[in-house]
Amino acid sequence: MAYRLARGLGRLLLQGVFGFRVEARGRENLPPGGGYLLLAAVHRGWMDPFLALDAVPVEPRVWTLGSGPSGFDRAWKERLLRIVGGVLPVWRGGVGIEVHVAAARAVLERGGVFSTFVEGTIGGPPDRPTPFRNGAFVIALRTGAPIVPLAVAGTEVLYRGKRFATRLMPPVTMAELVGEEWNGVPEPGSREELAVARRAAEALEALLAPVIAGIHPATVDPPGRRRRWPWLTGLLLGRPRA
């Protein structure tokens, strides 16, 4: 109940107060129920996980693997994230992949959705992804869960009335991403596992890149349009306004 209320209040704040507009498509591609990995790109700011939440239904619940330093760098952010819930913070150098695999298994076995942004860090061009990290694909190998790709665009700068776009794509498996080179699930912790994860990361990047490039123009305002409340970039993204 608290989770539903928090999501409703969050939508009221972002769309009603800040006037953010989201063009979200592709829910028809979601598998019935939960138990899948939601792997998203691009990752350009603190707003991105909220767009991932907006892209999917309220239930099943989404748990997001996110950056501890950027998500909890201000007291108000920490309070908001604790109210909304579902954030699994990552602190660089803190834990190994086994902890994240265990967290993903716990979420998936209960019918939830495990989400992360596969670039692994914030920053890069607004209309194309930076190279994907291997970690999410190791999780996919060890859990056997299907992958739902999510394209996100428009969060590189914020102001009142800013437009965003998301696209959910049909589920894919690790075997489908790897293609003809797939020889089954490799031994956990082996070099082969890392090699398979890398091939899958490159394949998903190739799959998402044209979708991101295609939806980004819809988030860009015409030249000369006045930007109201440009300070939202600094407030929500933690960097100077554009």
Per-range role (PLM):
Residues M1-L9:
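Helix-enriched interaction subdomains in cytosolic or periplasmic regions
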Residues R11, E78-R79, F137:
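Active-site phosphate/pyrophosphate- and oxyanion-stabilizing loops and adjacent acidic/basic residues
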Residues R11-H43:
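Helix-to-loop junction immediately C-terminal to a conserved catalytic motif
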Residues L13-G19, A41, V90-V95, P125-D127:
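Short, flexible loop segments at the rims of nucleotide/cofactor-binding pockets, characterized by
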Residues Q15, L81-R82, V107, A140:
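A generic structural signal for well-ordered alpha-helical segments
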Residues A24, R74-A75, E98-V101:
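Structural motif corresponding to alpha-helix initiation and N-cap regions
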Residues P32-G94:
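Catalytic core of membrane glycerolipid acyltransferases/transacylases, capturing the structured
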Residues E98-A242:
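Non-catalytic C-terminal accessory region of glycerolipid acyltransferases
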